[in-house]
Amino acid sequence: VVDGDAGVAIDDEASMATIVRFLKSLGHKTLAYIEQPINTTPFVCSDRLRKKGFSEASQACGYADEDIIVMPSLSHIDARSEQDIYSGIVAQLLSAPKQPTAICVSVDAVAAPLLKELRRMGWRVPQDVSLVGFDDDDTATALDLTTMHQDPAEIGRIAARKTLALLNGETLDEPFTVMPTSLVLRGTTERVS
């Protein structure tokens, strides 16, 4: 964001940091972060900010480098199908020197096929590994997925009001608005025993 730009967004970094602190409070020792496929979204900036928030919060919470697994975009995995992609991700997690006790994904859309593949490979969620998404879309509700909630409809309404005001030559009292997010606790996370 350039000073003076008008807009509305969430704080992706702070939101992901909230997720990391939550997982730390549950006693998770090894975290994995799985990026969103680059080719499926115009929101590359949000993905980058969420990854940065994950990395910085992990360090701030005292996680050592060997306790953090960051998986690159799924589009970097050589695969012919979506199942191949998620099989590849789970295989990499299984072969990691330390298997994660919790996995963060950059969007809920990644969590759904990942959850299916984790279960297919014998991992129990949340008993063996916790899983946290981001966005709180319909997928999250259907999967009982713990996730970071944002309100895209409200973001859109505020953006539309700002746009109309600018088109009418008005000066905005608040050019840039940062919208709140909240962690929605559901059935894919639990305290490490």
Residue ranges with predicted function:
Residues 2-193:
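Bacterial carbohydrate/catabolite-sensing allosteric modules
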